[in-house]
Amino acid sequence: MHPPAIALPDLLLALDGTPVTQPSQWAARRSEVHQLAVPLAYGPWPAVSNRTTCEMLHAATVRRFDDARLWTCRVLGDGIHRFLLRVFAPAGTASHAAVLNGDGCWHYATDTVIADMLRRGYAFAQFNRVEIAPDTPGARLPVGALAAWAWGYHRAVDALGQIDLVDPARIAVVGHSRGGKAALLAGATDERIALTSANNSGAGGAGCFRVSGPGAETLADVTQAFPHWFGPGLAAYAGREHALPFDQHFLKALVAPRALLTTEALDDLWANPVGSWRTHDAAHAVYDLLGAGDRIAITYRPGGHDHAPADWSTLLDYCDVVFRGRSAQAFLHRNRLTP
């Protein structure tokens, strides 16, 4: 199925009508893109912490993971918000590229997934985003939950920079479903994140508000069911998505030229795999402008809504491209399914 031919706002046309044709113009246009998309979609941003502390609570060797190192830390950001961060790293003293996941409230990162990550030479860090903001409709939050969860990713990146197990220049963030929305927002708003990956993230994530495939969650659906995720103004565009000054390709473009991977499932219609293709295609123009066309990828697998082992494996394959210089073309050639 091919995405409907509905026009999306032009990423390469500045607000004053000037075409953006040179890489040197992108910084100014990027600022516009951020202001058009992030405050409206996700609401006010949490206060930026001047100092994040990472207090180690426990260090251990994990036999079932071939003597991998495990650190359990308490992360304290802005002096108020605190959450636990667990970091696994392969045995030895080296620092490693790391995959950071905020879905500790779920159990998609099984022992098998973690063992494979460690075997392939990557560290794995995880926190529970609902320690930062509850995922409860009707909750009175000072900011939208997605913004709070993205803030949690940022504070976890702060903490990983204080841990010898991790190379802070090689951090990938990943999340699934609503966690994928948070991971994409985190990567779009923190240039320290080297690779951003959103899995089955749908409306408000890698999907598209204007372009919806059959059975896809709409802007009305998501803002009615989960108003606490978003900024207070977004719901007003339900049924009039054409009037939005942005769509989710804006969020993807904010990641450029850093690496971006979208992973989708062909049968996960609610997550709008058709719309995800459209926002990927539109954001690609910015990556091409910046000479980073091989740093944006989208893959589809058979099956439904899940952070499946195949999705984790695909992420590690792309980590090999970004962090170890493996062939991007070979990666894309192996992942040629389309919606």
Range-by-range predicted roles:
Residues 174, 199-200, 263:
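Alpha/beta-hydrolase-fold catalytic nucleophile elbow
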Residues 138-143, 218-242:
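Surface-exposed acidic, glycine/proline-enriched linker/cap segments
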Residues 184-232:
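Hydrolase active-site cap/lid region
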Residues 166-177:
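Alpha/beta-hydrolase fold nucleophile elbow
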Residues 1-84, 89-94, 109, 191, ...:
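Alpha/beta-hydrolase-fold serine-hydrolase catalytic core, especially in secreted/extracellular enzymes
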Residues 124-128, 197, 261-262:
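Short hydrophobic alpha-helical runs that function as membrane-insertion/retention elements
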Residues 94-162, 202-205, 209-211:
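Cap/lid segment of the alpha/beta-hydrolase catalytic domain
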Residues 175-185:
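Glycine-rich nucleophile elbow surrounding the catalytic serine of serine-hydrolase chemistry
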